Amino acid sequence: MTEDKPTPPPAFDRDRLMAWMDEHGVVGTTHDHPAVFRVEEGLELKAAMPGAHTKNLFLKDRKGRLWLISARQDTIVDLKRAPKTIGSEKLSFGNEALLYETLGVRGGSVTALGLINDPDRRVTFVLDKALWDADIVNFHPLTNTATTALDQTAFRRFLSLIGREPMVVDFGQLAG
């Protein structure tokens, strides 16, 4: 009888991420706040923070491929139309164990910054064009008790340093 091995802790947690960003010149501003699990819960908090706020969907397709869609919080992401656009099969939400194994976060803390915990690039990153075009983007720093604001230069530097080029999709037009 074989036992499942526990998933090892992720390489990066909030503190290690913040130290890594500082060391690599990825400048952002982090605001601590009460835990936020859904976009609607954080609306009042976000009103005081400039920039585009995000919703992040951790998804799996029928072939087992993993996807992270990061979109502006008010963007409609049509999960019936998205597969054709991004080249996937039917999408469904990935489970929490897989989320932790690949991005090193728990439900409610899904974030593009979690891609730093996926050096094997198991997760394909899809970014809403509204975020790609925003002056400032806001993501959880691997925990839903804080939000980190990055200007576009810092965000793109982060992606470049971890070797990620997002697939940019205009979800606003897709929902059309």
Where do the protein language model's features map onto the residues?
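Extended, low-hydrophobicity, polar/charged segments
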Residues: 1-176
